[in-house]
């Protein structure tokens, strides 16, 4: 199509070619142990949790965000219930 305006003689339609049909489904199967290994290799669900507590020296509010799994969050909670305390930047 060269020129100022396209004309019908410039357009060629090829109607006798049929597109090839391709199966997009994968028929590959994994061993069950291989699937379990892949599942175990994925990282545990990590989420951000906000922690709000008070400074052990002056009583100011201390806020922080931790990223961990639920099991680690429970351990952190147990530490706060025992002896772990936070100090604010002013008292540090």
From Swiss-Prot:
GO terms for biological process, alphabetical: DNA-templated transcription; symbiont-mediated perturbation of host cell cycle G1/S transition checkpoint; symbiont-mediated suppression of host innate immune response; symbiont-mediated suppression of host type I interferon-mediated signaling pathway
Residue segments, region E7 terminal domain: 1-43
Ranges annotated as unnamed zinc finger: 55-91
Entries under InterPro entries matching the protein: Papilloma_E7 (IPR000148)
Residue numbers covered by motif LXCXE motif: 24-28
PTM annotation, UniProt: Highly phosphorylated.
Subcellular location: Host cytoplasm; Host nucleus
Gene3D superfamilies linked to this entry: 3.30.160.330
Keywords: Activator, DNA-binding, Early protein, G1/S host cell cycle checkpoint dysregulation by virus, Host cytoplasm, Host nucleus, Host-virus interaction, Inhibition of host innate immune response by virus, Inhibition of host interferon signaling pathway by virus, Interferon antiviral system evasion, Metal-binding, Modulation of host cell cycle by virus, Oncogene, Transcription, Transcription regulation, Viral immunoevasion, Zinc, Zinc-finger
GO molecular function: DNA binding; DNA-binding transcription factor activity; protein domain specific binding; zinc ion binding
Residue positions of motif Nuclear export signal: 73-81
UniProt KW DNA-binding keyword: yes
Signal sequence bounds: none
GO CC field: host cell cytoplasm; host cell nucleus
Function text: Plays a role in viral genome replication by driving entry of quiescent cells into the cell cycle. Stimulation of progression from G1 to S phase allows the virus to efficiently use the cellular DNA replicating machinery to achieve viral genome replication. E7 protein has both transforming and trans-activating activities. Induces the disassembly of the E2F1 transcription factor from RB1, with subsequent transcriptional activation of E2F1-regulated S-phase genes. Interferes with host histone deacetylation mediated by HDAC1 and HDAC2, leading to transcription activation.
Family indicated by similarity: Belongs to the papillomaviridae E7 protein family.
Protein name: Protein E7
Origin species: Human papillomavirus type 2a
